[in-house]
Protein backbone atom coordinates (compact mmCIF):
# COMPACT_ATOMS: atom_id res chain seq x y z
CA UNK A 1 0.00 0.00 0.00
CA UNK A 2 1.32 3.45 -0.82
CA UNK A 3 1.75 6.12 1.83
CA UNK A 4 -1.15 8.10 0.34
CA UNK A 5 -3.44 5.06 0.43
CA UNK A 6 -2.50 4.42 4.06
CA UNK A 7 -3.24 8.07 4.88
CA UNK A 8 -6.62 7.79 3.13
CA UNK A 9 -7.43 4.66 5.15
CA UNK A 10 -6.74 6.53 8.40
CA UNK A 11 -8.81 9.55 7.33
CA UNK A 12 -11.71 7.25 6.38
CA UNK A 13 -11.81 6.03 9.99
CA UNK A 14 -12.56 9.53 11.33
CA UNK A 15 -16.23 9.07 10.47
CA UNK A 16 -16.39 5.82 12.45
CA UNK A 17 -15.13 7.33 15.70
CA UNK A 18 -17.55 7.13 18.64
CA UNK A 19 -16.88 10.44 20.40
CA UNK A 20 -19.96 11.72 22.28
CA UNK A 21 -17.84 13.31 25.04
CA UNK A 22 -14.69 14.84 23.51
CA UNK A 23 -16.00 15.37 19.96
CA UNK A 24 -12.37 14.71 18.93
CA UNK A 25 -12.28 12.06 16.17
CA UNK A 26 -9.10 10.13 15.47
CA UNK A 27 -8.48 7.53 12.78
CA UNK A 28 -5.52 5.21 12.39
CA UNK A 29 -4.15 2.83 9.77
CA UNK A 30 -1.42 0.38 10.74
CA UNK A 31 0.74 -1.36 8.14
CA UNK A 32 2.32 -4.70 9.01
CA UNK A 33 5.57 -6.04 7.56
CA UNK A 34 3.64 -8.40 5.27
CA UNK A 35 1.56 -5.51 3.87
CA UNK A 36 -1.60 -6.25 5.84
CA UNK A 37 -3.35 -3.09 7.04
CA UNK A 38 -5.47 -2.74 10.17
CA UNK A 39 -7.54 0.37 10.81
CA UNK A 40 -9.00 1.82 13.96
CA UNK A 41 -10.90 4.74 15.42
CA UNK A 42 -11.23 6.10 18.92
CA UNK A 43 -14.16 4.76 20.93
CA UNK A 44 -15.26 6.66 24.03
CA UNK A 45 -17.25 5.56 27.05
CA UNK A 46 -18.96 7.42 29.90
CA UNK A 47 -16.52 5.58 32.17
CA UNK A 48 -13.62 7.40 30.55
CA UNK A 49 -11.02 4.82 31.55
CA UNK A 50 -12.78 2.38 29.23
CA UNK A 51 -12.11 4.64 26.24
CA UNK A 52 -9.67 3.37 23.61
CA UNK A 53 -7.65 5.41 21.14
CA UNK A 54 -7.60 4.78 17.39
CA UNK A 55 -3.96 3.68 17.43
CA UNK A 56 -4.52 1.01 20.07
CA UNK A 57 -7.69 -0.16 18.33
CA UNK A 58 -5.67 -0.83 15.17
CA UNK A 59 -2.76 -2.41 17.05
CA UNK A 60 -4.97 -4.67 19.16
CA UNK A 61 -6.87 -5.79 16.06
CA UNK A 62 -3.55 -6.67 14.41
CA UNK A 63 -2.16 -8.53 17.41
CA UNK A 64 -5.41 -10.45 17.88
CA UNK A 65 -5.06 -11.63 14.27
CA UNK A 66 -1.48 -12.82 14.78
CA UNK A 67 0.45 -9.80 13.48
CA UNK A 68 3.27 -8.28 15.51
CA UNK A 69 5.70 -6.82 12.97
CA UNK A 70 4.62 -3.24 12.30
CA UNK A 71 6.21 -0.96 9.71
CA UNK A 72 4.24 2.27 10.01
CA UNK A 73 1.08 3.82 11.36
CA UNK A 74 -0.86 6.86 10.18
CA UNK A 75 -2.79 8.86 12.78
CA UNK A 76 -5.38 11.29 11.43
CA UNK A 77 -7.32 14.04 13.15
CA UNK A 78 -9.38 17.07 12.17
CA UNK A 79 -7.52 19.78 14.10
CA UNK A 80 -4.99 22.30 12.78
CA UNK A 81 -2.21 20.58 14.71
CA UNK A 82 -0.73 17.22 13.77
CA UNK A 83 -2.49 14.37 15.54
CA UNK A 84 0.19 12.78 17.72
CA UNK A 85 -0.30 9.67 19.86
CA UNK A 86 -0.90 9.91 23.60
CA UNK A 87 1.51 8.36 26.10
CA UNK A 88 -0.49 5.13 26.42
CA UNK A 89 -0.46 4.60 22.67
CA UNK A 90 3.25 5.38 22.48
CA UNK A 91 3.93 2.78 25.16
CA UNK A 92 1.91 0.12 23.33
CA UNK A 93 3.68 0.95 20.05
CA UNK A 94 7.09 0.77 21.79
CA UNK A 95 6.23 -2.73 22.98
CA UNK A 96 5.97 -3.97 19.40
CA UNK A 97 7.85 -1.65 17.04
CA UNK A 98 10.16 0.97 18.58
CA UNK A 99 11.56 1.89 15.15
CA UNK A 100 8.16 2.11 13.45
CA UNK A 101 7.40 5.14 11.30
CA UNK A 102 4.61 7.30 12.75
CA UNK A 103 2.87 9.57 10.25
CA UNK A 104 0.77 12.27 11.90
CA UNK A 105 -1.87 14.11 9.87
CA UNK A 106 -3.66 17.35 10.60
CA UNK A 107 -7.14 18.31 9.46
CA UNK A 108 -5.80 19.76 6.22
CA UNK A 109 -4.22 16.43 5.26
CA UNK A 110 -0.68 17.63 5.83
CA UNK A 111 1.67 14.96 7.17
CA UNK A 112 4.62 14.96 9.52
CA UNK A 113 6.63 11.76 9.83
CA UNK A 114 8.64 10.56 12.84
CA UNK A 115 10.35 7.45 14.06
CA UNK A 116 8.50 6.32 17.17
CA UNK A 117 11.55 6.99 19.36
CA UNK A 118 11.55 10.64 18.19
CA UNK A 119 8.05 11.43 19.50
CA UNK A 120 8.37 12.04 23.27
CA UNK A 121 8.86 15.82 23.04
CA UNK A 122 5.55 16.21 21.19
CA UNK A 123 2.95 15.86 23.92
CA UNK A 124 -0.83 15.60 23.82
CA UNK A 125 -2.76 17.59 26.44
CA UNK A 126 -6.14 19.21 27.13
CA UNK A 127 -5.38 22.10 24.79
CA UNK A 128 -5.98 19.69 21.87
CA UNK A 129 -9.60 19.11 22.86
Give residue ranges: language-model regions.
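Short loop/turn motifs at secondary-structure junctions and domain boundaries
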Residues: 19-22
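Compact, glycine-rich, soluble single-domain proteins
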Residues: 42-57
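C-terminal binding/interaction regions
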Residues: 2-16, 67-129
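Short beta-strand scaffold segments in enzyme catalytic cores
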Residues: 25-32
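Short, solvent-exposed cationic patches
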Residues: 54-74
Amino acid sequence: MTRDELCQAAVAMLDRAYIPYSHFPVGAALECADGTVFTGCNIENAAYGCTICAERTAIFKAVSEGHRDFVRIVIAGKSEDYCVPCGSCRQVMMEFAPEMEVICLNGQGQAKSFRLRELPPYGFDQSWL
